[in-house]
Amino acid sequence: MPRPSAGSHHNDKLHVKKGDTVIVLRGKHKGQTGKVLLALPRDAKVVVEGVNLVTKHVKPSAANPQGGIEQREAALHASKVALVDPETGKPTRVRKAIVDGKKVRVAVKSGKVID
């Protein structure tokens, strides 16, 4: 039986999900905000709208006969983003709480229910 690789210990859970508004905390895109377009929990990455744009060379195909060069969002590591507090507009951590018998996410800084 093969040994698992050193990087295979993953949690498969993220603190953000698709549709959340997040702010980038580190790197060259620090301070930019956007909506999460795609969450990749197995890789611990997220794709944020308008952030970390890369140039992609596209070959001509039936769907795109012209081909060409286009800009796309690339994935960021989930640890580099934080949820934007709906009340203050600043980055916040997230806590889970049970409200009316339902498990919801709560902003740590303001205590406001996120979903």
From Swiss-Prot:
Belongs to the universal ribosomal protein uL24 family. Signal peptide: none annotated. It holds the Pfam family ribosomal_L24. One of two assembly initiator proteins, it binds directly to the 5'-end of the 23S rRNA, where it nucleates assembly of the 50S subunit. The keyword Cytoplasm does not apply. The keyword rRNA-binding applies. It comes from Deinococcus geothermalis (strain DSM 11300 / CIP 105573 / AG-3a). SUPFAM superfamilies: Translation proteins SH3-like domain. Keywords: Ribonucleoprotein, Ribosomal protein, RNA-binding, rRNA-binding. PANTHER family: MITOCHONDRIAL RIBOSOMAL PROTEIN L24 (PTHR12903). This is Large ribosomal subunit protein uL24. InterPro entries: KOW (IPR005824), Rib_uL2_dom2 (IPR014722), Ribosomal_uL24 (IPR003256), Ribosomal_uL24_CS (IPR005825), Ribosomal_uL24_KOW (IPR041988), Translation_prot_SH3-like_sf (IPR008991). Part of the 50S ribosomal subunit. It comes from the Bacteria. GO terms for biological process: translation.
